[in-house]
């Protein structure tokens, strides 16, 4: 397309009735569009307490699906146990939905009633 622009400019330069700016741009004003970028909405992945899922299983889930180290996974597991729920992480919607689905599927396959859901952050 650059070659076509040069051909047009050359053609327009040959026309006596066409005025040009000093830079040879033939009076064409160009404004760059700057898109207004916004951060995507974020979602919390929340684990809920139940009376049947072993604490070790919850720690394993936090290590495997949320990449938490043993110490942090244990702290989150204790928060789930004592407060009834805890946030495992905050992600974009697609990632949060995928993680919650993976945790719920793994819990069902392991025959545990552990529940994981997402909530809009903020």
Curated annotation (Swiss-Prot):
<comment type="similarity">
    <text>Belongs to the ClpS family.</text>
</comment>
<dbReference type="GO" id="GO:0030163">
    <property type="term" value="P:protein catabolic process"/>
</dbReference>
<dbReference type="InterPro" id="IPR014719">
    <property type="entry name" value="Ribosomal_bL12_C/ClpS-like"/>
</dbReference>
<dbReference type="GO" id="GO:0006508">
    <property type="term" value="P:proteolysis"/>
</dbReference>
<comment type="subunit">
    <text>Binds to the N-terminal domain of the chaperone ClpA.</text>
</comment>
<dbReference type="InterPro" id="IPR022935">
    <property type="entry name" value="ClpS"/>
</dbReference>
<comment type="function">
    <text>Involved in the modulation of the specificity of the ClpAP-mediated ATP-dependent protein degradation.</text>
</comment>
<dbReference type="Pfam" id="PF02617">
    <property type="entry name" value="ClpS"/>
</dbReference>
<dbReference type="InterPro" id="IPR003769">
    <property type="entry name" value="ClpS_core"/>
</dbReference>
<protein>
    <recommendedName>
        <fullName>ATP-dependent Clp protease adapter protein ClpS</fullName>
    </recommendedName>
</protein>
């Amino acid at each position: 397309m650059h070659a076509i622009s040069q051909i047009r400019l050359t053609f327009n330069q040959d026309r006596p009735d066409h005025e040009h700016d000093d830079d040879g741009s033939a009076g064409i004003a160009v404004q760059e569009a700057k898109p207004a970028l916004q951060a995507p909405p974020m979602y919390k992945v929340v684990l809920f307490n139940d009376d049947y899922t072993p604490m070790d299983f919850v720690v394993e889930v936090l290590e495997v699906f949320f990449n938490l180290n043993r110490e942090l996974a244990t702290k989150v597991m204790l928060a789930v146990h004592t407060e009834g729920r805890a946030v495992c992480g905050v992600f974009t919607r697609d990632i949060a939905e995928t993680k919650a689905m993976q945790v719920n599927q793994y819990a069902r396959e392991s025959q545990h009633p552990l529940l994981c859901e997402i909530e809009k952050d903020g």
